Design a protein with these regions (language model features):
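A short, Lys/Arg-rich alpha-helix, primarily the initiator
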Residues: 1-17
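Short alpha-helical DNA-recognition segment
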Residues: 17-38
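DNA major-groove recognition helix of helix-turn-helix/homeodomain DNA-binding modules
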Residues: 49-64
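Helix-turn-helix/homeodomain-like alpha-helical modules used for DNA recognition
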Residues: 74-132
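"A position-specific structural signal for the A-helix of alpha-solenoid helical repeats
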Residues: 81-84, 117-128, 166-169, 208-216, ...
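Helix-turn-helix repeat elements of alpha-solenoid scaffolds
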Residues: 88-105, 132-148, 177-191, 220-232, ...
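Flexible helix-coil transition and linker loops at the boundaries of alpha-helical arrays
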Residues: 104-117, 132, 146-161, 191-203, ...
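Alpha-helical adaptor scaffolds
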Residues: 164-260
C-alpha cells in the first residue's frame, strides 16, 4: 500500500465513521487537521505513532489498517542516534564528523522517510545551523507549523523535544516577540514531570533540552526556575546511569552558585568536579573549554565584587 492508497483508505474509513477531520483530530495534540489532510491526500508519509493514533481513532488494530507497514531502516536509526548522542563542544573534527552523518542521512534515507522523521531531521539540522552560525535564521517554518501545538501539550514526544530544542536555540540567539520568553517559561514548568513520562532510551534528549533551558534562564537572570531543573537533571543521570553531560551540568551549577548565590567556594567545588568528570571520559578538548570558562567567570565575578 503506497502513501496515496493509505490516505484514501483513511479518508474512506473516517467518512464511513461520520467523522469530520476536526472531530477526528479532537484537540489536535496527537495529529492536526493540517497533518491529517496531507496524509489523506497521500502527500505525507505517516509515522508509526501517527498510524497507531489513526487506527485507535478508527477503532481497529494497527495491521488491520496498514498490514504492510515497514519499520525505519536500522542504519538510519543508528545515524540519527549518533548525531543526537555525540556532543561536539565546538570541536571542529567532531563537527565535521556530525556533518558527514547528516549528509549520509539526507543522501541515502531522507526521501523515503515518514513525514515525522523528516521533520525530526530538519529540526536537528536547523538546530545545528543556528548554533554554528549564531543566528536565529533556521527552522522557522518548522516552528510556525508545530510549536503552538507542542506548547499546549502536557506530554512531549521525541519529535516535540527536538522542536523545542530548536525553539530554545533560536531564542538564545534572539527573542523576536515578547510572548516567546513567556512560552519558554511555561515549557520550563512542564519539563520536570516529563522525566517519568519520556521513554528511558529517550531521556538524553529531554536532558539536553533542560540543559539548554538552564543556560537560557541564566542568560536572562531568571534564576528561580533553575534549582527544579537541576533536580530533574540529577534524577535523569541517576535513573539512566548516563553521566556524559555531567561536566556540563556542573558547569551550569558553578555559574548558578557564582551569579545567583554569590558563593565562590561552592562554585569552585562544582568546577573541580566538572573537570574530574571530563578527565574520566577522556575529553581533553572539553577540559580546556571548562578551564577557559572558569577563568572568564572568575574574572567577571571578581570585577562585579562577587569573589
Amino acid at each position: 500500500m503506497n502513501d496515496k492508497e493509505f490516505g484514501q483508505r483513511v479518508r474512506q474509513l473516517r467518512e464511513n465513521a461520520s467523522l469530520t477531520r476536526e472531530q477526528f483530530c479532537d484537540d489536535e495534540l496527537e495529529i492536526s487537521v493540517r497533518q491529517l489532510t496531507r496524509i489523506e491526500a497521500g502527500t505525507s508519509k505517516p509515522t508509526f505513532s501517527k498510524i497507531q493514533y489513526i487506527a485507535t481513532r478508527l477503532g481497529m488494530g494497527l495491521y488491520e489498517l496498514m498490514p504492510d507497514y515497514v519499520s525505519l531502516p536500522e542504519r538510519y536509526s543508528k545515524l540519527k542516534f549518533d548525531v543526537l548522542r555525540t556532543p561536539t563542544y565546538e570541536n571542529e573534527e567532531l563537527m565535521e564528523k556530525r556533518a558527514d552523518l547528516m549528509t549520509e542521512i539526507y543522501d541515502d534515507y531522507y526521501a523515503d522517510l515518514p513525514e515525522e522523521e523528516k521533520i525530526a531531521i530538519d529540526a536537528i539540522q536547523s538546530t545545528i545551523d543556528v548554533f554554528e552560525t549564531k543566528t536565529a535564521e533556521f527552522g522557522q517554518d518548522i516552528l510556525d507549523d508545530y510549536f503552538e501545538q507542542i506548547h499546549r501539550k502536557k506530554q512531549f514526544s521525541v519529535n516535540d523535544l527536538l522542536i523545542i530544542q530548536l525553539y530554545l536555540i533560536n531564542l538564545r540567539m534572539e527573542v523576536k516577540q515578547s510572548s516567546d520568553f513567556q512560552y519558554f517559561l511555561e515549557l520550563v514548568e512542564k519539563f520536570p514531570s516529563q522525566v517519568e513520562l519520556v521513554e528511558s532510551g529517550d531521556l538524553f534528549i529531554l536532558r539536553d533540552v533542560m540543559i539548554t533551558s538552564v543556560g537560557l534562564l541564566g542568560q536572562k537572570e531568571e534564576f528561580s526556575y533553575i534549582p527544579t531543573l537541576f533536580e530533574a537533571l540529577d534524577k535523569i543521570m541517576q535513573k539512566t546511569q548516563d553521566f556524559q553531560k555531567k561536566p556540563i551540568l556542573n558547569l551550569l551549577k558553578w555559574k548558578y552558585e557564582l551569579y545567583a548565590n554569590n558563593d565562590s567556594e561552592e562554585a569552585r567545588r562544582f568546577y573541580e568536579e566538572a573537570v574530574m568528570f571530563a578527565k574520566l571520559i577522556g575529553n581533553a578538548h572539553l577540559i580546556d573549554k571548562l578551564e577557559e570558562d572558569w577563568q572568564i567567570d572568575m574574572k567577571t565575578a571578581e570585577y562585579s565584587g562577587g569573589v
